[in-house]
Amino acid sequence: MATAFWLLLFLLGSLHVLTAAQNSSQSEWPIHDNGLSKVVQWDHYSFYINGQRIFLFSGEFHYWRIPVPALWRDILEKIKAIGFTGFAFYSSWAYHAPNNQTVDFSTGARDITPIYDLAKELGMYIIVRPGPYVNAEASAGGFPLWLTTGAYGSTRNDDPRYTAAWEPYFAEVSEITSKYQVTDGHYTLCYQIENEYGQQWIGDPRDRNPNQTAIAYMELLQASARENGITVPLTGNDPNMNTKSWGSDWSDAGGNLDTVGLDSYPSCWSCDVSVCTGTNGEYVPYKVLDYYDYFQEVQPTMPFFMPEFQGGSYNPWDGPEGGCTEDTGADFANLFYRWNIGQRVSAMSLYMMFGGTNWGGIAAPVTASSYDYSAPISEDRSIGSKYYETKLLALFTRCAKDLTMTDRLGNGTQYTDNEAVIASELRNPDTNAAFYVTTHLDTTVGTDESFKLHVNTSKGALTIPRHGGTIRLNGHHSKIIVTDFNFGSETLLYSTAEVLTYAVFDRKPTLVLWVPTGESGEFAIKGAKSGSVAKCSGCSNIKFHRDSGSLTVAFTQGEGISVLQLDNGVRVVLLDRQKAYTFWAPALTDNPLVPEGESVLVSGPYLVRTARLARSTLTLRGDSKGETLEIFAPRKIKKVTWNGKAVEATRTSYGSLKAILAKPPSVELPTLNGWKYSDSLPERFPTYDDSGAAWVEIDANHMTTPNPNKPATLPVLYADEYGFHNGVRLWRGYFNSSASGVYLNIQGGAAFGWSAWLNGHFLGSHLGSASIQQANGTLDFPANTLNTEGTPNVLLVVHDDTGHDQTTGVLNPRGILEARLLSEASDNNDDDSPGFTHWRVAGTAGGESDLDPVRGVYNEDGLYAERVGWHLPGFDDSKWATVNGTSLSFTGATVRFFRTVIPPLSIPENTDVSISFVFSTPNVNNTSAGNTSAFRAQLFVNGYQYGRYNPYVGNQVVYPVPPGILDYNGENTIGVAVWAQTEAGARLNLDWRVNYVLGSSLDAGRLDLSFVAIAYVYIFECLQL
């Protein structure tokens, strides 16, 4: 009676829902193109490529955050292996334009053509996002820092000065991309103009009052893209649901793009969730947002497209070591990505898929060195539960062709017999295949709920499961229940177990289903009459029920893999979650959509990167820890190779091939010892000669600035106006008077710091705070620190910056806003109060001239050690003092540079080895009088600055450094610059560790590192004092 009652209730509710859906939909949605080609088209449902609908599942990576081109293959193969059909990347204007006369897309890791070539080889569509502004938690949002002086206007508008600045870069990246478009047989799918530029309207977008300046800017960008060969759709991304910009469905105002999408970070883009309340409201873990109504209102004739959906969160300076992985982990991936499918999203790109590292000075002040982003692929390139959980959905969306065209017929609790569980019904109007996306009614609770689901099928209305048991949602999870799911020539009438994937071998399909470990499932396959258990590993309670025209199978699956064989030739593989995590479907083709007969199924390894089939030989590449390999593939296969070596494979009774992979060897790292050191702050002494090429004279002629943020005192002491744009800068101010002190107000961004010395005597510091961007202080001049009359006094101010601000803050200056000598006259506002006679400033050696084009101008800053090349391989430190022991410690407020050279590492062949450096502060004295953690350290590895360690301000202690920066076959030069901000000095240790060792086709010890050859050359002749 209960079942009949619920079924009747469901049928009555469905009648209303279906009628409402039909009344609000169109029988024919327009198919759009951009008028240049019909290769890429789109409509209300999805994108088309060459007439075939696609579900675009993509993930973002930034090549400039992993400046080792040989490792781009590693990241992109992992993105492909997860089941994605595409990837996205920002191009960084800053990375390619060290000055306003240079656009470099050819040197080292600045050559982006390997990315396009890899996309073609691996079979993935690309969303190219060239800016000019990209945000990305990059310094100045990816703008080159020479743009931040104010001389180019306020930016992101149609100011001719700004236009002249971006046009050479934008033309170059467009021209390069134009050779790799899907319209010409390559895989660039679309080209995003600007980023999160929701400025089309003045005021409320519903008033549709056009912002003509923003419209003119967008039209200039579009014209440039087209003039330089871009023929694929031009796209945009709204930053949130409030801006409603650039879509022709919303308005026919100027500047509209071909297609637009919506960015969303429902759990906050930062580990500091307070920064998101203005967009998302109060943070509640696992609270989902409604997108369906937004898309229906704003872009009903376009695909529901999310160019950025939350793949993790960046970690601010005061965030936890390792980031906030628990906030956006495997459960987040399970729930939120399925929720989006229930919202009818058919194109989604995760930001980030791989974050990488903010090496050098590329970060904005909001984050430290790590850009791990809690992404599915970690900063150290490892994969874990979040990656595997995402794969469970991605492989499904790749094989579920009917998901590319669905109407949402309803959503609510009427679909279930448990009022705590809701479902959204998506149905393909052409095939009648349906997808029921089930979640908790309140997604924030995560309770253990069991339920039955009311569905409509080609066999009529059913309540499933039909033969006992229930469907279960245990925790912050979602399940997609399919009906009339087509696989090969067969039809899955329904399944309460989720579909992972399927493949067709020898004209017979193999269907792969999974459930959480220990849960039950039930599925029905049309046309089958009987079945048998070919393998039972963890299975129980398997029962076959013959129904009218179909066979229903009920089962429970514990940890393991079970295989069923049906009489119609269908093979069904049953997996629990853990086995599903390491079950792969590598493509045999470079077609991103992977036709059903163009893949094999592989179980066991940590990662399966690629598969190729030639005659009777199956060639697999991947990473392993010594697992058992099981392959479901065509019967013609007689030989299997793994990473180029034949493996002894035996055939099972149910048709698979099994082999045991070798365990990788262990790797031990040598001790980091043999340290030497030298003082790196000679500039604090009045006898230092600052007349060299490294120093720029600042005199009374520099009394104005184009920056709208004016200084309080003159001359202008904004570092960017003198060509020094990142990291540490040194200012030497000269005066002749008998001042009693100095007032300084300095701006360097969140977490920055400064210190000051008078004639070699330490005066004081701003130690820094994650929340303070600008800091002032009054410093008294102690007795006997001033020189006698006739000898000038020298005030040295050392400050760093943590990057330039983003969005509207890109013009916020970096440098000294106010420098005022104090005396009795100044206290009385006397015109004869003392002043500085002149200043000199030093920063990155060569300024904008890019002396080291491989590492680039963002790698070094202005410390003496960097200006003269102590951090580079090849420097002769034989006359330096030797550190006793392994602690890099000293007393006194100064900068000391430590350096050691480590003999070649013993990295075995055919492995991938990941290594991190780990800082610690032993026996730290945190009293105000003797704080030995009040220092700022920079880690250099073979000349690359690969970590900023500020223990007084931030919490990051682990710094992954990839192969290619670390030389796995030669010596490694390790340097640490330590700036002690108190007289107590600094105490720190540096160690390193192996994150993992895998048997791997990557062969990390033998990468092609030809791109770094110039970077390892000793370049003293270019460096400056």
Curated annotation (Swiss-Prot):
Gene Ontology annotations of biological process type: galactose catabolic process; polysaccharide catabolic process
Signal sequence, start to end: 1-21
Reactions performed catalytically: Hydrolysis of terminal non-reducing beta-D-galactose residues in beta-D-galactosides
InterPro entries associated with the record: Betagal_dom2, Betagal_dom2_sf, BetaGal_dom3, BetaGal_dom3_sf, BetaGal_jelly_roll_dom, Galactose-bd-like_sf, Gly_Hdrlase_35_cat, Glycoside_Hdrlase_35
Record: active site: E196 (proton donor), E308 (nucleophile)
Record-annotated disulphide pairs: C271-C324
Annotated glycosylation sites: N23, N100, N211, N411, N456, N736, N776, N884, N925, N926
Gene3D superfamilies: Beta-galactosidase, domain 2, Beta-galactosidase, domain 3, Galactose-binding domain-like, Glycosidases
Subcellular location: Secreted
GO molecular function: beta-galactosidase activity
Keyword Glycoprotein applies: yes
Pfam families (alphabetical): BetaGal_ABD2 (PF13364), BetaGal_dom2 (PF10435), BetaGal_dom3 (PF13363), Glyco_hydro_35 (PF01301)
Cellular component terms per the entry's GO annotation: extracellular region; vacuole
Family matches, as SMART domains: BetaGal_dom2
Residues noted as binding substrate in the record, renumbered to the chain: Y90, N135, A136, E137, N195, Y265, Y373
EC number of the protein: 3.2.1.23
The entry's keywords: Carbohydrate metabolism, Disulfide bond, Glycoprotein, Glycosidase, Hydrolase, Polysaccharide degradation, Secreted, Signal
Family indicated by similarity: Belongs to the glycosyl hydrolase 35 family.
Function recorded in the entry: Cleaves beta-linked terminal galactosyl residues from gangliosides, glycoproteins, and glycosaminoglycans.
Protein name: Probable beta-galactosidase B
